């Protein structure tokens, strides 16, 4: 496992978008991204900050079910 890059909220949303997530709405400083599957829906809130902290980024990765390598 490589080291995670420092990403902005906008960059994270672009990565999620390339994997089928779409922006549902914005509220304050957060963007809610959602991916509909056959039997469920994955919802991931993304803070719209210049730099997302590592712990927050790990939480987004875990919630989105995407491989960590997509964010490195």
Model-predicted segments: where are they?
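Basic nucleic-acid-binding interfaces
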Residues: 1-26, 30-72
